[in-house]
C-alpha cells in the first residue's frame, strides 16, 4: 500500500461504520450520523450549418429544432432560423423540453408569404438547470408562424424555450455523474447531469456543478458540506482552484477531494488531479491526487462485489453454485417463505413468511437463529440498506418500515418511514427496493414504476420523498423490480412481446432487454455485476450482461420455477 493510501486510510477511520454485531442477532446496529445556479455550456469549436437557400418551411423548422441542441453563444445557431425581430425577443433559456418525436402539420389559411405550422409530440422529459433530466409524460402542442424575409422563409413567432427530440438529446449530450456523499459519509451517490458533448472544458463544467451542490431531486438524500461562499475559480496552470472552503475540517476536505476526483475520473478526465482551496492544497500533505489515493470511495467499487446466488423454491431457500443446490438450514427450509433478501457479507437473511393467515418478516443468520420483526396482513419483499445497516419492507401496501438492531438493547427496532406520494398517485405499493447506495428507492404502485429519495429528517427517522414516475410508457404492466449494481433499474412486466425492461435511474431512457425465449409475466428479477436472473411463466432463467441475448435455465434448477435472490 502506498504512503498516500496509508495516510488517507488513517484520515478516513472516523468515517467507517461497523456493519455487523455480535451474538445470535445478525442485523447491524442502528447508527445515525448526521443553490443550484443557472447552467450554461462551454463554447464549442464546431461550425453549425444554418438555413440553406430556398429551403422549404417544414425542412427549415426541422433544421431549427436540430440547431437547438447547440447551446453555445446563447443558441446562436438556432437564432439563425428566426426573423430579425424575433431573434431579439425569443428566450431559448425559458425551458428545454424533450419530445419523443416532433410532428409537423401546416394549418389552414397558409399563404405564399405566411404559414402557421402545428407542432405535436409526447413530452417525455425536461432538461432543467444544471443538466438535470426530469421525466415527464404529457402531450405537447404549439404553433409556429413563418414569414418570408428577403425572399427566404424564417420563423417569426414561436414559444419560448428549446424543443429537442430525444434522439438529438442522446446525440449531442452525455450523462455524467456529479458525486455527493450519503448522510453517513460512507458512500458517494451519483447525481446525473446531461452535458453538451462539444464543451471545450468538461472538467470545469463538472467542478462548477459540484460546487453548486446537488440537484433539487436528490438534494434531500445527500450531504452538501460546502457553504454558499464556496466557488470554483477555474482550471489554471494545471490546478482546479476553489475558494470559500476555509470552514472545512480535515475530514470534510477529504470527502470533498473524493467527490472532485471521482467526478472527474468517471467523466474520463485524466489524472493526477491538483486541487487548490483558497490558494493552498486542498489536502495539505497531498498536493496531487489519483483515484488510487481515494480508492476507498470508488462509487463503482460495489459493482464488482462478489455475489452469491440463492433460489426461493417451494417456500424454501437454497444456495446455488456451479450447478449444486444446497438448502439453507432451519426455518429457511420450512416451505413457508414468500420472498427474501440476503446479505452474505453480513450473514443476514430477511424473509417474509406466511403463518396463520399473516405475513411475518423474519430476520436472522443463515444458520437459522432468527427473530420475528414484523407481522401484518401483507409485507413486501425486504430490501437492505447500504452495507446492510438496516432493512426495509412495506406493510399493508402503504407504510414503509425500517428494521435495525438497537445499539443499546440489541433488540430489533421497527421505525415507520413517512412516504410522500404525488397527489394523483394512489393504490398499494406492491414492490419496494432500495438502490445499492440506499439513497434511492424504487417502487411499483398499481403497475407503475416510481423512484424516490430516502431522507433522514432526524436521528433514526426516514422519509421517502421526491417520488417520480420513471417508466410511464410501460403503462400499468410492471410486476417486479431490481436495482443493478450500476444503478440501472430492471423491471419485469406482463407485456408479452417485451417482458423485461431496463430504466435509467433519472428516467431519461427506457429500453427492452432481450426477450427471445422469455415468456411473460416476469414475476421476479435479480442481478449481479455480470448476470441478470428472472422468473418467467416457466422457469428461472439467466442472461450474462455482456453481449448476450439468449436466456438459459440455471444449472441445478432445470425445469423448476424458482425465484432468484442475489446476495452481496
Curated annotation (Swiss-Prot):
- Which subcellular locations apply to this protein? Cell membrane
Q: Where is the signal peptide?
A: 1-23
InterPro entries from the entry? GerMN (IPR019606), Lipoprotein_LpqB (IPR023959), Lipoprotein_LpqB_C (IPR018910)
Q: Where is the lipid attached (S-diacylglycerol cysteine)?
A: 24
What keywords is this UniProt entry annotated with?
Cell membrane, Lipoprotein, Membrane, Palmitate, Signal
UniProt lists the family membership as follows:
Belongs to the LpqB lipoprotein family.
Membrane association type: Lipid-anchor
| UniProt keyword annotation of Signal present | yes
**Protein's UniProt keywords contain Cell membrane:** yes
* Top-level taxonomic group: Bacteria
Which sites carry lipid of kind N-palmitoyl cysteine? Answer: 24
Q: Which GO terms describe its cellular component?
A: plasma membrane
Please tell me the species this chain comes from.
Corynebacterium glutamicum (strain ATCC 13032 / DSM 20300 / JCM 1318 / BCRC 11384 / CCUG 27702 / LMG 3730 / NBRC 12168 / NCIMB 10025 / NRRL B-2784 / 534)
The protein's name: Lipoprotein LpqB
Q: NCBIfam families from the entry?
A: PRK13616.1
Q: Which SMART domains match?
A: Germane
Amino acid at each position: 500500500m502506498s504512503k498516500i493510501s496509508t495516510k488517507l486510510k488513517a484520515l478516513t477511520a472516523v468515517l467507517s461504520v461497523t456493519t455487523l454485531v455480535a451474538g445470535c442477532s445478525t442485523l447491524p446496529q442502528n447508527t445515525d450520523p448526521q443553490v443550484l445556479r443557472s447552467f450554461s455550456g462551454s463554447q464549442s469549436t464546431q461550425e453549425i450549418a444554418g438555413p440553406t437557400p430556398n429551403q422549404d418551411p417544414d425542412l427549415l423548422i426541422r433544421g431549427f429544432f436540430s440547431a437547438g441542441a447547440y447551446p453555445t453563444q446563447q443558441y446562436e445557431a438556432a437564432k439563425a432560423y428566426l426573423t430579425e425581430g424575433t431573434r431579439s425577443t425569443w428566450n431559448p433559456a425559458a425551458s428545454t423540453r424533450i419530445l419523443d418525436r416532433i410532428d409537423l402539420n401546416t394549418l389552414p389559411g397558409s399563404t405564399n408569404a405566411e404559414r402557421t405550422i402545428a407542432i405535436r409530440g409526447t413530452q417525455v422529459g425536461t432538461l432543467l438547470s444544471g443538466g438535470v433530466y426530469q421525466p415527464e409524460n404529457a402531450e405537447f402542442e404549439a404553433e409556429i408562424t413563418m414569414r418570408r424575409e428577403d425572399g427566404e422563409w424564417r420563423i417569426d413567432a414561436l414559444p419560448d424555450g428549446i424543443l429537442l427530440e430525444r434522439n438529438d438529446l442522446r446525440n449531442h449530450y452525455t450523462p455524467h455523474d456529479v458525486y455527493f456523499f450519503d448522510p453517513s459519509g460512507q458512500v458517494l451517490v451519483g447525481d446525473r447531469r446531461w452535458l453538451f458533448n462539444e464543451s471545450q472544458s468538461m472538467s470545469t463544467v463538472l467542478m462548477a456543478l459540484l460546487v453548486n451542490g446537488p440537484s433539487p431531486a436528490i438534494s434531500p438524500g445527500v450531504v452538501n458540506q460546502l457553504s454558499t461562499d464556496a466557488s470554483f475559480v477555474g482550471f489554471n496552470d494545471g490546478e482546479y482552484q476553489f475558494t470559500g472552503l476555509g470552514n472545512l475540517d480535515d475530514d470534510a476536505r477529504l470527502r470533498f477531494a473524493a467527490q472532485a476526483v471521482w467526478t472527474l475520473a468517471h467523466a474520463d478526465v485524466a489524472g493526477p488531479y491538483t486541487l487548490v482551496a483558497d490558494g493552498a492544497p486542498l489536502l495539505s500533505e497531498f498536493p496531487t491526487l489519483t483515484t488510487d489515493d481515494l480508492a476507498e470511495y470508488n462509487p463503482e467499487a460495489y459493482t464488482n462485489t462478489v455475489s452469491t446466488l440463492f433460489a426461493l423454491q417451494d417456500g424454501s431457500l437454497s444456495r446455488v453454485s456451479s450447478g449444486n443446490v444446497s438448502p439453507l438450514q432451519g426455518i429457511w427450509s420450512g416451505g413457508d417463505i414468500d420472498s427474501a433478501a440476503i446479505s452474505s457479507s453480513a450473514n443476514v437473511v430477511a424473509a417474509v413468511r406466511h403463518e396463520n393467515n399473516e405475513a411475518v418478516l423474519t430476520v436472522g443468520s443463515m444458520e437459522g437463529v432468527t427473530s420475528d420483526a414484523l407481522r401484518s396482513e401483507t409485507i413486501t419483499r425486504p430490501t437492505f440498506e447500504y452495507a446492510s445497516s438496516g432493512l426495509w419492507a412495506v406493510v399493508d401496501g402503504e407504510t414503509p418500515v425500517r428494521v435495525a438492531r438497537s445499539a443499546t438493547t440489541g433488540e430489533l427496532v421497527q421505525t415507520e418511514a413517512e412516504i410522500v406520494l404525488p397527489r394523483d398517485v394512489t393504490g398499494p405499493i406492491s414492490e419496494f427496493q432500495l438502490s445499492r447506495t440506499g439513497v434511492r428507492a424504487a417502487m411499483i404502485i398499481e403497475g407503475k414504476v416510481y423512484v424516490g429519495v430516502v431522507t433522514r429528517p432526524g436521528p433514526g427517522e426516514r422519509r421517502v420523498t421526491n417520488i417520480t414516475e420513471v417508466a410511464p410508457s410501460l403503462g400499468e404492466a410492471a410486476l417486479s423490480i431490481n436495482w443493478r449494481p450500476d444503478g440501472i433499474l430492471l423491471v419485469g412486466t406482463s407485456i408479452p412481446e417485451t417482458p423485461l425492461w431496463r430504466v435509467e435511474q433519472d428516467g431519461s431512457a427506457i429500453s427492452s432487454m432481450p426477450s427471445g425465449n422469455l415468456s411473460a409475466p416476469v414475476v421476479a428479477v435479480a442481478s449481479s455485476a455480470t448476470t441478470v436472473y428472472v422468473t418467467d411463466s416457466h422457469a428461472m432463467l439467466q442472461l450474462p450482461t455482456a453481449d448476450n441475448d439468449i436466456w438459459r435455465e440455471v444449472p441445478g434448477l432445470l425445469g423448476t420455477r424458482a425465484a432468484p435472490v442475489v446476495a452481496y
